[in-house]
């Protein structure tokens, strides 16, 4: 759930493919060792994919590298950059793989992986039959005989390449500010999908007028223009009544806002990006969009998703159901979520929330920092976890901010933290996508490799140490109890406050009743995040709980929905 900007500054493709794995917040990083860890991880992932492509297609390593580059889109110079890497490093990679060396040995020889004074030798694959040092020395001898070692051995930064500098700057700006990069009128809504555009918050319908944006109350009943971008405007010629007044007045419109981490934003790396037997041109069609959304897919998330699910299940996002309940809520969604977000650092980007107390509709706010307060990459992980006292102070600061920005009549729902022991229990003896071809990399090995590189996103739960996993769950329960206490004892002028458990065990039980297995609810590449199915099942449980216990939170069901569809169709889409 933690993926900082630095991840875009190592060796291109690998980071495109392994961005999820280098998942610790930048504010906590030990500098060079973290950067070296990213470079190592990216190199091992990329060399593994090249090696497996050669094996699957019974081709040479050279052909495998060219095949991989041919799969990539031209957008964002991805294909160009791939061929640049092949030209720079390809000859040496060929020589090393031709010597039957595994990807981790190759990357140590190429010095993408480094062993420091306190950094152990990290390996993903089973150790070679010969001693590790002997294998590494053999690899170095191969490179000494190479005539192509013309590239620098340190300070690699793909963003220094002239044709990638602007792309990197755009992504960096998007991540740091958490507001749309393309937003002419600076109203925090955009007509562009990615780079924090309408994949994250309702699409603007007039990007040259900052008084026009989703979620606002209509201006003069939107007689002349659609000021709130819900697709309802103008006057009914039959009776002279404005459509907004006829269809929406008294229907209690409201928006949905998520304050979340990468789980809420639906962080997702398609496994076919790493699985040689499944790779094709079609596998990477969404790569440019995913990269400019920080490898998140909020348009498919459980809270703010507006596209139909790709998973095939019937459950819908909370926004989707809120819009179905009242079509006047069209486009009123915001995903104020960020990779690495926690109660500690939400204050750094909560200003990106777009809500005006004087001119906007109320909102339902879901506070869902479900992991990073107990998850970190530190070797001594427990002291780095948020304490109940810190959680109380952090959340109260957030709620105070919301009280000064949300319109009266809003609602805030605090999500508890899950018990993440299911991660290890469900995955540790299964094969990671990189290990499925040759049955040589389990999730236990993968987690250990990340931990060695100081990149494990959750040393507490993604650990073979059962005692540590238990301690992490105990702290998560303490923090959930703190949230529950806040919800039951604190009051605010502009919103009421509720608490819901993030009961992942109930989601697992639900899924098993449908014939599924727990591991099918976890993102396969990072082995950490809930996947699309899990997010939608959780959204369904939250919706049902609200509907049963606090139905006023959802507002009325609009009796004019069918008439809105008849007059305005899909209301301009999303």
Curated annotation (Swiss-Prot):
Site features described as Interacts with lipopolysaccharide, chain residue numbers: 344
UniProt-annotated location(s): Secreted; Cytoplasmic vesicle
SMART domains: SapB
Alphabetized PROSITE patterns for the sequence: SAP_B (PS50015)
Primary site of residence: secreted
Region: Lipopolysaccharide binding, residue numbers: 172-176
Record-annotated active site: 262
Limits of the Saposin B-type domain: 36-117
Cofactors required: Ca(2+)
Taxonomy, superkingdom: Eukaryota
Cellular component GO terms, alphabetical: cytoplasmic vesicle; extracellular region
GO molecular function, one term: acyloxyacyl hydrolase activity
Propeptide positions: 23-33
Catalyzed chemical reaction(s): a 3-(acyloxy)acyl derivative of bacterial toxin + H2O = a 3-hydroxyacyl derivative of bacterial toxin + a fatty acid + H(+)
Matching SUPFAM superfamilies: Saposin, SGNH hydrolase
Subunit: Heterodimer of the large and small subunits; disulfide-linked.
PANTHER family for this protein: ACYLOXYACYL HYDROLASE
UniProt protein name: Acyloxyacyl hydrolase
Species name: Mus musculus
Gene (UniProt): Aoah
């Amino acid at each position: 759930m933690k993926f900082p900007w630095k991840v875009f500054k190592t060796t291109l493709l690998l980071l495109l493919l392994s961005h999820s794995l280098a998942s610790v917040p930048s504010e906590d990083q030990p500098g060079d060792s973290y950067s070296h860890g990213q470079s190592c991880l990216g190199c091992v992932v990329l060399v593994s994919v090249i090696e497996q492509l050669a094996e699957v297609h019974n081709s040479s390593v050279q052909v495998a590298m060219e095949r991989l580059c041919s799969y990539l889109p031209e957008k964002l110079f991805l294909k160009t950059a791939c061929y640049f890497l092949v030209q720079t490093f390809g000859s040496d990679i060929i020589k090393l793989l031709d010597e039957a060396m595994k990807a981790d040995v190759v990357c140590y020889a190429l010095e993408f992986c480094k062993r420091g004074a306190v950094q152990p030798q990290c390996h993903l694959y089973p150790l070679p039959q010969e001693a590790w040092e002997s294998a590494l020395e053999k690899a170095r001898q191969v490179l000494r005989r190479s005539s192509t070692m013309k590239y620098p051995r340190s300070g690699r930064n793909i963003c220094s390449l002239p044709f990638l500098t602007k792309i990197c700057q755009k992504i960096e700006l998007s991540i740091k500010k958490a507001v749309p990069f393309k937003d002419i009128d600076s109203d925090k809504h955009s007509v562009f999908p990615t780079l924090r555009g309408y994949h994250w918050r309702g699409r603007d319908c007039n990007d040259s007028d900052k008084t026009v944006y989703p979620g606002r109350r209509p201006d003069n009943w939107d007689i002349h223009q659609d000021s709130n971008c819900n697709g309802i405007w103008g006057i009914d010629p039959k009776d002279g009544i404005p459509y907004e007044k006829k269809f929406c007045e008294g229907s209690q419109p409201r928006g949905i806002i998520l304050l979340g981490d990468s789980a809420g934003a639906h962080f997702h790396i398609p496994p076919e990006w790493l699985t040689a037997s499944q790779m094709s041109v079609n596998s990477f069609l969404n790569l440019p969009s995913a990269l400019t959304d920080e490898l998140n897919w909020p348009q498919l998330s459980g809270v703010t998703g507006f596209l139909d699910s790709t998973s095939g299940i019937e459950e819908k996002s909370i926004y989707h159901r809120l819009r179905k309940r009242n079509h006047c809520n069209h486009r009123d969604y915001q995903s104020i979520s960020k990779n690495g977000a926690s109660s500690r650092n939400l204050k750094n980007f909560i200003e990106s929330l777009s809500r005006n107390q004087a001119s906007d509709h109320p909102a339902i706010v879901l506070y869902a920092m479900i992991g990073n307060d107990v998850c970190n990459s530190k070797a001594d992980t427990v002291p780095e976890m948020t304490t109940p006292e810190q959680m109380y102070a952090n959340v109260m600061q957030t709620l105070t901010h919301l009280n000064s920005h949300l319109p009266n009549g809003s609602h805030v729902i605090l999500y508890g933290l899950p018990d993440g022991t299911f991660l290890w229990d469900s995955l540790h003896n299964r094969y990671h996508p990189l290990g499925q071809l040759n049955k040589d990399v389990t999730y236990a090995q993968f987690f250990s490799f990340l931990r060695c590189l100081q990149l494990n996103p959750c040393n507490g739960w993604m650990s073979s140490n059962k005692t540590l996993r238990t301690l992490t769950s105990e702290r998560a329960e303490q923090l959930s109890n703190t949230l529950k206490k806040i919800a039951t004892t604190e009051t605010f002028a502009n919103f009421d406050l509720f608490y819901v458990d993030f009961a992942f065990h109930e989601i697992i039980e639900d899924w098993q009743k449908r014939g599924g297995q727990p591991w099918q609810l976890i993102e396969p590449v990072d082995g950490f995040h809930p996947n699309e199915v899990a997010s939608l099942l959780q959204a369904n449980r939250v919706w049902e709980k609200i509907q049963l216990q606090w139905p006023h939170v959802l507002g009325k069901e609009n009796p004019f929905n069918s008439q809105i569809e008849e007059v305005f169709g899909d209301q301009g889409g999303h």
